[in-house]
Each structure stands twice: as structure tokens, then as C-alpha cells.
């Protein structure tokens, strides 16, 4: 199959043999595509190597043969955001999450839109944690894994003052008592869930619980195997 003039975001790149690269690209029309870029070394290939970097929006043509497509041509369509510190790790995170969750060669246009929006958000001065929670919510929605952010698992309206445990299958389970500190760590306030559903940033005190709860849901859909970027973010937080 010939893929011509397709737009996509570079999610991941690694060296293959001495002069080639294996590139994972998220596209709107073909889903996540694996590319084999041969012979990218040398001064004449400098522009191509620069284009094949994570977070970069490219236009490419390739021939699909089996699992990997043979890259014929690629060029950068813009300048990828220059991220540093926490935002750089966040960029790694959004790419790794879609590398793991986006289906190969199966288009999910909503995921392409999620990535484009998150990429723009990371380049802004807006609150980073809130941008990532919105991204996670939209990714789950795009994959058909969204849960009700207005009602709990019993169909009752979510109570802003109550706490809930997020179940990947059943949604928000109301917690009637919290006997241990660990119980509280594993729950999220109803106010935070309602805010997420209304696309309004929750109170700062509610953000850690929302992060942990969303991570638990994502971990389920990742097959129980976490992300490298999660560990990197935790290591960074411990060093501060």
C-alpha cells in the first residue's frame, strides 16, 4: 500500500543498524504507523534527521510492506516545541502513552487531535498538570474507554463533597468510608470529577488525587505495565 503526503506526529525514534532509523508516527488517516527510514546518515540527510524527531509534525510518503512501511520522503511542517524540564518529560509522556495505546495501522482521528492539542498546550504557559489530565481524559474518550463524569456507578449524580474510586469498567464508585490514609490516596473528590467533565481546572488540593486516579485507569488499559515516563516524573519529584 502506498501512503502519500500523509501528515503525522513523530512519537518515537530509535536507531536501526548503522545508518537507519525505526520511527513511530501518529497519523489521522492511517493510525500509528511504523516507518523504516534507511540511509539517514551523512550531511545530505541532515534535514531528514531533523524532521524525524519526537513531537515533530511531518509530511511523509511511504510504501507499506508488512508491519513496517518503507519511508520514501519526509519533511518537517513546522518547528517542534522546544521543551525543557517538566514540560520535556510531559512531552515524552504524551508520546509514550499514545505509542502504547494507539492501534497500529488503525485510524483513530480523535487521538491525532488529542496529540495536536496537547502539543500546543505544552508550548504554552498554562498549568501543566491540568493539561495532562485533559489529555488523558480525551485519550480514553477517543479509544472508547470514557466513563461518566456526571453520575456514579449506581447512576446517582456525583456529589462534589464525596470521594470516589475510579474503576476502569464501572466508572466512579462512591467511597462510604476511608479508614486508612492509603484509602484517601486512592480516591478522588467528586468536585474534581465534575470539573474534569466540565473542562474546568479543579482546585489545586484535588489535583493529586485526580492524577493518581487517572493513572490507575490508564494502567488497566496498558495491561498493568506502567510507563517509563511515570517513573521519570516520580524520580524527578523525589529529588526536589
From Swiss-Prot:
Protein's name in the database: DNA repair protein RecO
Keywords of this entry: DNA damage, DNA recombination, DNA repair
Functional description taken from the UniProt entry: Involved in DNA repair and RecF pathway recombination.
GO term, biological process aspect, one: DNA recombination
Record carries keyword DNA damage: yes
Signal peptide: none
Family matches, as SUPFAM superfamilies: ArfGap/RecO-like zinc finger, Nucleic acid-binding proteins
InterPro entries linked: ARFGAP/RecO, DNA_rep/recomb_RecO_N, NA-bd_OB-fold, RecO, RecO_C
Organism: Xanthomonas euvesicatoria pv. vesicatoria (strain 85-10) (Xanthomonas campestris pv. vesicatoria)
